[in-house]
C-alpha cells in the first residue's frame, strides 16, 4: 500500500514493484480522499480484496452497494440539523470521537448532515445567556463528564431544553443532571 497525496504514476508503481519484489499489480495506491468512508471503494477499484482473497485461497465477492449508498447520502444530504454538544471538554473534540461518528452515521441514515455546535458548560451561568446560546440548535446532547465543575450549567441546560421543548439526550452525568433538574 502506497500512501500518497497524488495519483501514483505507472512508472513509480513499477519502480516500487521492482524494489519490493512484487508484481506491479500488487502495488496498491492509497491516495488522499475527502472522507475515510471512500477508502474501501478506492481499494476495491484496484482489486485489493481480490488480491488478498487469491493469496489466501478464499472465495471473494465484494458487497459494496450499501457502502456506495451510504457515501451518496453522506455527500448529498437532504437536510441539515445543528446539535449542541455540551460538556466540559469541548475544546478537545477527539474526547468525543465516538459520539461524533455516531452523529455521522445517524445523519446519513436520516439523509441529514449533522452540524455540531460546541458549548462549554462553564459558559452557561444564568438563564439570560442561555436563550442566545441555544437559539440556533435543533437538539441538545449533554455529554458525559465527572466532578462538579460545570454542573450548574448542565442543570440550566436541562431546564432550558425541557421548557423550550428542544430534543434532548443526556449521557451519564448528563442524564443525572436532567433527573436533578426535574426533581
Label the model's feature ranges.
Residues 1-182:
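N-terminal beta1-alpha1 cap of cysteine-dependent amidohydrolase-like domains
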Amino acid at each position: 500500500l502506497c500512501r500518497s497525496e497524488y495519483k501514483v504514476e505507472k512508472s513509480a508503481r513499477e519502480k516500487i514493484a521492482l524494489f519490493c519484489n512484487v508484481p506491479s499489480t500488487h502495488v496498491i495506491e492509497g491516495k488522499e480522499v475527502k472522507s475515510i468512508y471512500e477508502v474501501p471503494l478506492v481499494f476495491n477499484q484496484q482489486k485489493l480484496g481480490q488480491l488478498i482473497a487469491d493469496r489466501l485461497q478464499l472465495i471473494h465477492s465484494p458487497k459494496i452497494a450499501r457502502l456506495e449508498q451510504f457515501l451518496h447520502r453522506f455527500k448529498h444530504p437532504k437536510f441539515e440539523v445543528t446539535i449542541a454538544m455540551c460538556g466540559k471538554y469541548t475544546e478537545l473534540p477527539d474526547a468525543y470521537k465516538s459520539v461524533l461518528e455516531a452523529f455521522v452515521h445517524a445523519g446519513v441514515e436520516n439523509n441529514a448532515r449533522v452540524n455540531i455546535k460546541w458549548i462549554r458548560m462553564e459558559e452557561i451561568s444564568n438563564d439570560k445567556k442561555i436563550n442566545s446560546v441555544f437559539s440556533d440548535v435543533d437538539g441538545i446532547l449533554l455529554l458525559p463528564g465527572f466532578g462538579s465543575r460545570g454542573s450548574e450549567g448542565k442543570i440550566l441546560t436541562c431546564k432550558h431544553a425541557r421548557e423550550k421543548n428542544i430534543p434532548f439526550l443526556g449521557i451519564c452525568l448528563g442524564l443525572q443532571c436532567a433527573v436533578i433538574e426535574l426533581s
